[in-house]
């Protein structure tokens, strides 16, 4: 058998070793090692055991075979990154000046396996129960009788109900199991990341009549999907113009093609309302991924995505790296938001990274915003992106009245307050009607304080 070699990135973030080291793949591990998997390797003069990521496999080497080291083992708890995400990590490294290990760890939000949640079930193992029931009654075995009668009606019940609601001890269950009356089975299940209230909304979406502009956009997207054309679209729509309805319909077209979609939102705080909205259309085939989930919950959602158990994943930046096998569409809502730019190395931008992942996967990207970023708008105007414009609100809803007040005029009139006379009058008017008011203070903007004196 021809010897194979693996290019391995060491799990140490340091520029001095920010390159691939080639190791021999032992024959016993050939079937287990593939691009993206984690391996244990001897490293350095002392052959200290380190973890590394395989980023390539070859049957050739430029090094002296007698001086090469051999991979020790495959990490049993490690998670392999799909090959395309490894390629994306390489792109992040080159474009954002990070180390390869940092880039790999970025595209792998879940790095270790987590023990599955195991649910135990109790079921009847016999068809005829009359004699057994009579025997339990004669012995006054109340707990056994209670469980037997419950199983006659439900056939199979979770162990949690047996020991909780029915008050049957584990010893009693074991005794009935030894008698051959019942069987106990185990089944792994995914951790729930959405509330019961959200799950009740499944497929409860109202019938919405799309307007001509929405239909025109959706039909164009459908034509591109049918022709296997993949591009980046900028959906420039005013607030309330129905961009979310367009997202839903475009996702439907992608799912009909047997593919999957990622929806990025700028803030975790928007997760609840977003997941609730999409659940109405896609039921439990939609899930959420964000940093508020436990490691087990995140692991389960990525496993669901990898196995094709979900069609839509919603979340902030990190959701971009969901390991879908058949990714067809990435949607970035409020694409102008600064939160899509990572503050930690590698300081990647989710918008640009999404476009690159779409290129690698053969997918499309929709950037949505009422106020697009200058970069995206320029690319749309130059033809690099396809521009969709929605300049009217749905159902003839009017735009909110907006007033711009020049505080320099207020100063000339002697008003040195941060509240203009017009704003003070409007506040007084609304309070007199027992209405509520929201005042936004610019403390998180580019300039936290502005005072114009002339």
Regions found by a protein language model. Give the residues of each.
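Accessory, non-ATPase domains that flank or precede helicase/AAA+ motor cores in DNA-metabolism machines
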Residues: 1-369, 381-397, 431-432
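Conserved interdomain linker/interface between the two RecA-like ATPase lobes of SF2 helicase motors
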Residues: 356-368, 373-444, 448-453
